[in-house]
Design a protein with these regions (language model features):
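Accessory beta-strand-rich segments of carbohydrate-active enzymes
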Residues: 4, 12-15, 29-34, 61-176, ...
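Beta-strand-rich binding/interaction modules
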Residues: 98-100, 189-224, 232
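Accessory carbohydrate-binding/adhesion or oligomerization-edge regions at the termini
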Residues: 1-58, 133, 137-141, 213-215, ...
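Signal that preferentially marks extracellular ectodomain short beta-strand elements
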Residues: 117-121, 233-249, 532
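Substrate-binding/catalytic cleft of secreted carbohydrate-active enzymes
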Residues: 335-580, 586-591
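Conserved, mostly hydrophobic/aromatic
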Residues: 28, 102, 167, 252, ...
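N-terminal carbohydrate-binding accessory modules
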Residues: 180-181, 255-328, 582, 587-589
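Surface beta-strand/loop "capping" patches
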Residues: 171-201, 284-289, 582-591
Length: 592
């Protein structure tokens, strides 16, 4: 990648699209200082949206707690006149303040969620200056940070900070659509569209059109069907009822608009949705299974951490993302567990289009972890400790001692659902992983079911299981696998992780994994043996979801199916496909 490139130029928000769009990705000026004040001198250029810690940014420097990362660039307003001009950030890690032409236009905290500022009043007619100041405490704070650490090694990776998703401008009408909530109902064969405008309370008329394959199949042009709260429900005709599934990921196109007065002010946005239904129900033998559209489905997938060697959280291109996801699908997988990270919106859009199901982790945070307890001791003594209660007495051990930390998690959970709920690919929320920052898991399940009643919840992936949610979620790297059906559906939500550092591909400083192969042939053989001799027999014992560790190598971890650079598949691809076909056939026979 060269600094002259314009990275990630694609429209960043496919589920709420307008024709007006101008990317601000590219070269910005930067400086790292000890002060929040505008620096007197810039240190050089940084390629946005790559964090300064990454090679792709051209900087290669780690932001320390207490330091300020400053960005600066000039820009012209989007083409057109009138209305409002919005400045969007896909994600900035962690806290930032934004100025335009010396005017503070807003601030934000939270490193994984999009935010927007109306900068109209701060704009000049032609030349404008944008300044962003960022702080990121990484492990010194309680905020969501995932696998980031200032001391990387093993299963934890280099910290990154600042802008790591697309920055962009758009021109909108005065009373524009701020948010669009699309709620499909599989059983009723309807879709309810709700729009919130920038100036609520007025006599805004909402209209919506649904198309399937370019053909208009349902529409409402502001008739009495439109509610006064800005919502409209449309019926999907029987002949155009196409359920979404991995084998047939059909997406309906949706256009939504508003009019006001005598159509003097209006907005039009484009989106999409799918009709699909998640549930847990007994199979023909009475064993609980995950069901998609009322049919048992084996969820066969991979743990996906979403790291790239040059950009860490940020991919080299949209094409690289699509290629990886397509290859995963071609290998016979239908599930990705998005682990300790929230991706840019386009990643979920591609999963929607390709038919890849996503189990979405809440990004872990809290006070510094006592890894000797939550990771190492519990992993080894899992039979004794995996159901340890996450009550107030243990909040210190689980890194949620402070009220501020717990309140931060509550805000982050709601922000995650708000940002991602429109994506059909997401089938399950995972509020906690292996006790990292876990507290009151039962309350988290209740909150998620209230915010989003149409999806499943894996209360505590691995441990500490409180007996709630929809999933009996097991991690197993070391013990013989003995499962049995119960009142929740059984998932092996982490396992495998066989390491092999493939020669010629990003050699690690240290090799990390769960058992090490010495060659491609050995890796392929061990993978096949694990899947067919250990995992497959457990299907009859209720096993309904598999999450092998992992998609790709990441830093020291060399237990991926792909190399870190995504240039090679480490085991024999034909063998992986054959194994997945065998698992699917065995599951179909088991549930009959």
């Amino acid at each position: 990648m060269t600094k002259t490139q314009h990275p990630l130029p694609e429209y960043p928000r496919p589920a709420l699209r307008r024709d007006s769009f101008e990317s601000l990705n590219g070269l910005w000026q930067f400086a790292i200082t000890k002060s929040a004040q505008l620096p007197r001198q810039w240190e050089g250029d940084i390629l946005v949206p790559y964090s300064p810690e990454t090679r792709a940014s051209g900087v290669g420097r780690t932001l320390q707690p207490g330091e300020w990362l400053h960005y600066h660039r000039s820009f012209a307003p989007p083409a057109g006149s009138g209305g409002r001009v919005l400045l969007h950030f896909g994600a900035v890690d962690y806290a930032c303040a934004v100025q335009v032409n010396g005017h503070l236009v807003g601030g934000h905290r939270g490193g994984y969620w999009p935010f927007t500022f109306d900068i109209t009043e701060a704009l000049n007619a032609d030349h404008n200056r944008l300044w962003v100041a960022v702080q990121d405490p990484t492990g010194a704070g309680v905020q969501a940070r995932g696998k980031q650490t200032l001391r990387p090694g093993g299963m934890f990776y280099p910290a990154q900070s600042g802008i790591w998703q697309t920055v962009w401008l758009e021109r909108v009408p005065d009373n524009y659509i701020e948010t669009l909530t699309v709620t499909p109902d599989y059983d009723a064969r309807t879709v309810t569209v709700r729009a919130r405008t920038a100036k609520p309370g007025g006599a805004v008329n909402l209209w919506a059109v649904v198309r399937a394959g370019g053909v208009t199949i349902a529409e409402d042009w502001g008739s009495d069907e439109a509610d006064r709260d800005g919502a409209v429900t449309l019926n999907i005709p029987e002949e155009h009822f196409f359920p979404w599934s991995p084998d047939s990921p059909f997406l309906y196109d949706l256009t939504v608009g508003t009019t006001q007065g005598e159509e003097e002010s209006f907005d039009t946005v484009h989106s999409y949705f799918a009709l699909r239904k998640w549930s847990c129900a007994p199979d023909a033998k009475g064993v609980l299974r995950f069901c998609l559209n009322d049919r048992p489905l084996l969820l066969n997938g991979l743990l996906d951490q979403g790291y790239w060697p040059e950009g860490l959280y940020t991919p080299p291109s949209d094409a690289a993302v699509v290629h990886e996801l397509q290859t995963i699908k071609e290998l016979g997988f239908n599930l990705l567990r998005k682990h300790a990270k929230i991706e840019p919106q386009r990643w979920y859009y591609h999963c929607d289009k390709l038919g890849l199901i996503v189990w979405q982790d809440m990004v872990n945070g809290g006070e510094p972890y006592r890894l000797w307890f939550v990771t190492y001791l519990t992993n080894v003594l899992q039979p004794l400790l995996r159901k340890l209660p996450d009550t107030a007495a243990l909040r210190g051990l689980l890194s949620r001692r402070s009220e501020a930390s717990r309140e931060e998690y509550g805000r982050e959970l709601e922000a995650t659902v708000e940002a991602l709920r429109g994506h059909p690919c997401i089938g399950c929320w995972v509020p906690f992983n292996e006790g990292w920052g876990q507290f009151d898991a039962a309350q988290a399940v209740e909150t998620l079911h209230t915010l989003d009643p149409d999806r499943l919840v894996d209360e505590a992936s691995g441990w500490y299981d409180q007996g709630g949610g929809d999933v009996d979620s097991r991690h197993n790297y070391f013990y013989p696998l003995h499962l049995r059906p119960g009142r929740r559906t059984v998932a092996l939500s982490e396992y495998g992780g066989i390491a092999w550092p493939m020669p010629g591909h990003e050699p690690p400083r240290r090799t990390y994994g769960y058992g090490t192969a010495k060659s491609r042939a050995e890796l392929t053989g061990r993978y096949r043996k694990l899947q067919l001799e250990t995992v497959l027999p457990q299907l009859r014992n209720g096993l309904s979801a598999l999450v092998y560790t992992q998609v790709s190598d990441v830093e020291d971890e060399v237990n991926g199916l792909f190399t870190y650079d995504r240039a090679a598949i480490k085991p024999d691809p034909a063998a992986v496909r054959a194994v997945n076909q065998a698992l699917e056939a065995a599951f179909e026979k088991t549930v009959e």
